[in-house]
Design a protein with these regions (language model features):
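Conserved alpha-helical positions within TPR/SEL1-like repeat arrays
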Residues: 119-126, 154-169, 196-211, 238-253, ...
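C-terminal boundary/linker of central alpha/beta nucleotide-binding cores
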Residues: 1-62, 71, 75
Length: 467
């Protein structure tokens, strides 16, 4: 009986009974023997089973738990969670089980025979928004794959692609690049025809390069993906629309708004025309089109498109999904920019969107994630445009701290927030601080050939010299 206890710490009593077929008398016997302890934080319905700390230290931590000893238990959990219809696992029962998977996984010694099991667990943890735990399983699996020199090409590609996706969510772009490049090498060495798969990976790699502010390399990968599609006459509307969309993102980052909008519209038209439209991707198109209109100062159009995207996302995602936060924050930006330029709009319309977006990001992604930094930048701008410069600087500094920690030193987003800090410090006549941040922005912008941004920064540096 005690062999199964390696996986039960913190599990609710009703799950303990369901998955191990233990009845109340069994549980009571274990409690009397001090194998387990029971607590009821919110009454009997929330009763939880925990290993007694002394038993855990003496029996569990000083032995080598075997995956086989708990395999029935683990497989029942996986079977149950795989059957969940939702893309994101969020109900309390499933979350309890995901916690068990994550914690149990730290205790077992895996071999190459368990690669499929580990991959299944990683996917389940991804769906439950447990990104670090999911990535831990994937990296363990990749270590085994590389050590054993597996011939299972499909499994290798699945591991590399999923590890890349999770690393992107964790904002570890260099690791994501490594995983996708390993997938490309695997395909090239396989001697098999993976043309469509290769095009997809090139597109994903381009997205990571864009996130890492490597725009020319990103465009190169998108072009490679499109060339593979054209040469091999691949009919894949989803992939083709993704490439158009991703090129649009590059062009908007380069301030080439006409090309950005043209690519976004092509992506939208393809996504809306297929037999079974993917609402998630259509929402992305609406969101991105709204962003172009925002940059073109067409705020009414921007708000319309961004709200269309939010409406779809709220239908298909749980309330705490980070993509909801992206929509909320962008609508807040729309209202902020509109209020700055048009008296018929009001700044107060923006703040509720910012506050909710920040709350979601801190809860699901953490305080030090790049998306959380975007929330702080947006809130800082909201204060700045209202003349609240100290509050703006406070939020800008939080944003800068995150970006310096997470992103590469010469990232465009670090330059952007450094410029905003210089601008705010100049407003309160703190010339030394203003110049310090503007010089950092200038250095990065020059290295990235951001001509328009560089001109604005150099203009403010001249103002510093005159003050």
């Amino acid at each position: 009986m005690n062999l199964s206890l390696t996986s039960i710490s913190g599990i609710r009593q009703r799950l303990f009974k369901q998955f191990l077929d233990y009845n109340n008398s069994d549980i009571n016997a274990l409690i009397r023997q001090s194998w387990i302890i029971q607590n009821r934080p919110n009454g009997p319905a929330s009763s939880q089973i925990h290993l007694h700390p002394v038993i855990k230290a003496a029996v569990i931590n000083n032995t080598e738990p075997s995956l086989e000893k708990c395999s029935v238990f683990i497989n029942k959990i996986i079977e149950f969670l795989k059957a969940a219809s939702a893309d994101v696992i969020e109900d309390s029962m499933s979350n309890d089980l995901c916690d068990v998977l994550a914690n149990a996984g730290l205790m077992f010694k895996y071999t190459s025979e368990h690669l499929g099991l580990m991959y299944d667990i990683a996917l389940i943890l991804w769906r439950s928004l447990m990104y670090h735990e999911s990535y831990s399983y994937l990296t363990k699996g990749l270590e085994l794959l590389n050590k054993e020199s597996s011939d299972d090409i499909e499994l290798q590609l699945s591991y590399y692609e999923t590890a890349g996706k999770v690393a992107v969510r964790l904002a570890d772009y260099e690791k994501a690049i490594t995983h996708y490049q390993s997938a490309i090498t695997t395909i090239e060495n396989s001697g098999q025809d993976f043309s469509e798969r290769l095009a997809t990976i090139y597109d994903k790699l381009g997205v990571v390069m864009r996130k890492a502010s490597k725009y020319e390399q990103a465009l190169d990968y998108f072009t490679k993906a499109q060339n593979i599609i054209d040469i091999n006459h691949i009919k894949n509307p989803e992939l083709t629309s993704d490439i158009y969309n991703d090129m649009g993102v590059i062009y908007i980052n380069l301030d080439i708004f006409d090309k950005a909008l043209a690519n976004y519209q092509k992506a939208r038209e393809i996504r809306e025309s297929v037999e079974n439209p993917d609402l998630e991707q259509i929402a992305y198109s609406y969101h991105n089109i709204g962003t172009v209109y925002q940059r073109q100062k067409k705020y009414a159009d921007a708000i319309t498109w961004h709200k269309k995207a939010l409406e779809i996302r709220q239908e298909i995602y749980p309330d705490n999904e980070p993509i909801i936060a992206a929509s909320l924050t962008m609508i807040g930006n729309d209202y902020t920019q509109a209020a700055k330029n048009d008296s018929s709009y009001h700044f107060n319309d923006a703040f509720e969107y910012f506050a909710k977006g920040l709350e979601i990001r801190k809860l699901t992604l953490g305080e030090t994630h790049p998306d959380t930094a975007w929330s702080y930048q947006s809130i800082g701008l909201w204060h700045f445009y209202q003349g609240e410069y100290e509050e703006a600087i406070e939020n800008y500094l939080k944003c800068l701290s995150i970006r310096k920690t997470i992103l590469q030193p010469s990232h465009a987003y670090t330059a952007e927030i450094s410029y905003l800090l210089g601008e705010a410090y100049l407003k309160i006549n703190q010339i030394h601080s203003a110049k310090e941040h503007l010089l950092l922005a200038e250095k990065i912008q020059a290295s990235l050939h951001k001509v328009k941004a560089l001109e604005k920064t150099q203009h403010l540096l001249k103002e510093c010299s005159l003050s």
